[in-house]
Regions:
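Charged, alpha-helix-forming regions
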Residues: 2-292
């Protein structure tokens, strides 16, 4: 190969490389910009996600700023000790027990416009936040009739959640389940037995006219549940509920701590792993539930 041929081949290779680089640059220019890195590394090397940072900021605000009037929330004392299921339950009944407290939830029927429809057992974040908001209004205003907003979007906002199609579906499903559920709450010889919700107009859409589903607007608590709630309400902080809304387990741990710390006087209390497992891990089953 002559010198001239070698130079020509080298120029061709350089041209191919430049062409490849140009093509790659054009492809990258057409792609959306990379997402902003939301992770943060602390001086000790701990990696914090964006959610971790928000939780730390919320906890700092709660620790340094006393709750205002709108920050105060309430829930039933027994539900602080034994909450609703955190994941979907197969079947029509759910039982949870911890120490002297226990809860039994039974699925019920709700008329959705064309006769009775069996509802699932309420589970997850949505019924926890919904029940806390309803209980808060009842305790603050000494009222059994609870206004739950003029729309589903407003009720989601009241619970500190953004409104989107997926949340609308979850809200409808879980509010129907909660309204239909039969609840038994027991503690040291006393049992509440009934339905927390006495009346709830189902969130029904008119499929024939394609109208948007009508939001019921009002929920009526049963007299027995209302009386039990007023007698044993536990104060919570709405800011904490909103910060922890991404996890049913986190909400359960917070409500449990709020209830326990509210009662502790003088000497501290030693908590053993066995009691914590009984409190929060009854739903973990399988080959190695302790590890899970």
């Amino acid at each position: 190969m002559t010198k001239k041929q070698r130079e020509g081949q080298g120029a061709q290779q350089i041209g191919e490389i430049m062409g490849d680089l140009l093509a790659q640059a054009q492809i990258k220019a057409a792609l959306p910009p990379p997402k902003r890195q939301t992770k943060k590394i602390t001086p000790t090397g701990l990696i914090l996600t964006e959610r971790d940072q928000k939780l730390i900021e919320a906890s700092a605000e709660i620790a340094t700023t006393p709750p205002g009037g709108e920050d105060m929330a309430f829930t039933h004392a027994v539900l602080c000790q034994v909450g609703l299921p955190r994941a979907k339950v197969e079947g029509r009944e759910f039982m949870r027990q911890s120490g002297a407290a226990w809860v039994n939830v039974q699925a019920g029927y709700l008329d959705e416009g064309h006769g009775p429809v069996l509802q699932p057992i309420p589970y997850g974040v949505m019924p926890r936040l919904g029940l806390a908001w309803v209980s808060t209004f009842a305790v603050r205003n000494k009222e059994r009739e609870i206004p739950i907003g003029d729309s589903a979007a407003e009720f989601l906002r009241l619970m500190g959640m953004e409104s989107d199609g997926r949340r609308y579906t979850t809200l409808r499903k879980q509010m129907h389940a909660l309204a239909a559920a039969r609840l038994q709450l027991g503690f040291k010889g006393r049992t509440y037995n009934g339905q927390p919700v006495q009346q709830f107009d189902a969130w029904v859409a008119n499929k024939d006219t394609q109208q948007r589903a009508l939001w019921p607007g009002v929920m009526l608590l049963s007299e027995d549940y209302y009386g039990s709630l007023i007698e044993s309400a536990v104060p919570l902080d709405n800011r904490a509920l909103h910060a922890l809304k991404g996890s049913a387990l986190a909400l359960d741990v917070y409500a449990w701590l709020a209830h326990r710390l509210h009662r502790i006087e003088g000497r501290g209390v030693t908590l053993h792993w066995k009691s914590l497992r009984e409190q929060f891990a009854q739903e973990y089953k399988g080959k190695d539930p302790d590890k899970d």
